[in-house]
């Protein structure tokens, strides 16, 4: 026999896997549900970033305004604190993460766990499905807070800044 020719053989599994893989229909429906959530989550993050930038800009405008010092401080302070609380619910406490301490589960931690369900060889498990559902529920609870900040709180602060003759720092 030659060593360089083709040789047919059968591969026998050493052991059976513990988990049975999911069927394509289940996997695909999970993947679609995850993608819908991913788009929603990404849009919430984008709005959060825009809100943070506006708060920072409005703070600069208040510092440069010709009105009495501190007049806008309470409104801006409350908006900033509300924004930080929302960020904590979405991503966990950044200070805790920085020093390696565990955070309570956030939308991000549930999303990451749910996302790992599409990267496994056997498909999403019940744990992945549960994490995705929790992330969706948490996002639904937090979305009204984000939208209130965007549509009510920040426009109200802008009107107050304009009435106090604060410069428009967004165009500077």
Where are the model-predicted features located?
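Mature extracytoplasmic or organellar-lumen-exposed domains after removal of signal/transit peptides
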Residues: 7-19, 23-172
